[in-house]
Amino acid sequence: MAHVAFTTFAVLKHPYPHPDNDSFNDLEPLVFGASETSPGFVARATAVDTVTTRWTNFGRDYGEWGMFQAPSFYTGGREDDTDTRASTLSLWQDLESVFAYAYSDIHLHALRNRREWFVHLPNRLYAAWWVPEGTVPTWQDACERLEYIDAHGPTPRAFDFREAFDADGSPYTLRRPASPKASA
């Protein structure tokens, strides 16, 4: 059975340590915790090294997920005091599971407040793709998929919720919940 690989990317208005990011930085561990307890969650990229950076992922080793990378359209800083990118990479049992997580509870609260923290980018900021069960996507894969969907639009290689594809590459209509709810 295939799994859905899912990556997100955004750019903060200010580097991580800026006081305007305090509410985002406080929310981040709650958002990650909620993902890990969501139905359909399989795994997410977490660093395995002991590098003592507070904010940046650049230079970090994520084990089988690979060394951290950002898509080529990111031109921001790469040090703790200059890094402005926010990115995730995760695996899910199916597309409905990641959609349900993304548009409910604490993550929906974060989405609704994204303009407070993030700059508007002309690029696609998330991508999904299917991987065989047991395959772990890498940060390099994530960057390639983000760049691909940005250049070519949704295809079986990289797609979004609006134009999804099943594991066989056929167009797929996402079965969405009736009404997302936010508890925050």
Predicted ranges, named:
Residues 1-85, 97-100, 124-184:
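Short S/T/G/P-rich N-terminal loop/turn motif that feeds into the first structured element of a domain
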Residues 91-92, 117:
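Tryptophan-centric aromatic hotspots in well-structured domains and transmembrane helices
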